[in-house]
Amino acid sequence: GLVGLALVEQLEQTPEFEAITVVVRKESQLLNTYKKVTQLVIEDFLLLNDEDVNGHTHAFSCLGTTLKMAGSKQAFYAVDYEINAHLADLVQDKHIHLLLVSALGANANSPIFYNKVKGQLEDYIESLELEKLSIFRPSLLIGKRSDVRFIEDLGQSLFKLIENKFQKPFKYKPVTVEQLAHTMVVAALTQIEAFKRYDNLSIQQTR
């Protein structure tokens, strides 16, 4: 996805990270252009196992979809909850820092299915008490997509109009995928706390 690619680009340029393993369903020619990247091809991400994650210091999850792309609530849940929860299970009891992209409205009690699933996932992963966990809650993400997500595209246009009047960061202001990726890299390198949640404002203000 867009966030994942932006993250790979920044990790490639960060000397503290010597190697990057990217889990993909099929090999990407674009990823082959990065010197640090090794692609781990797994058609079903639920088959990711201990051997695959051992030896890593950080696990970044930018995995997510939309109800429209998934086609059903069940398919959406399988991607956004089950795969991310599986990754969290794998890194538990290992010296691995998990960094997870969630959503601004994540709330297990939300009447909105998307936000509810995001909240349930956050609650589950927090309950694992991982050695180190970062959760990022961005608002709408700005970036070019190969697929058209009309609501998000409309949101980007509306927020860009609002920004002309309100230049200071505010809670719902959209962020670029590059800024989110930058915040994740900064968190990976500097976070001291065992658990920290980065809200949309924190993401905007990270330098």
PLM features: residue spans?
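Glycine/Thr-rich phosphate-binding loops of Rossmann-like dinucleotide-binding domains
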Residues: L30, M69, A108-N109
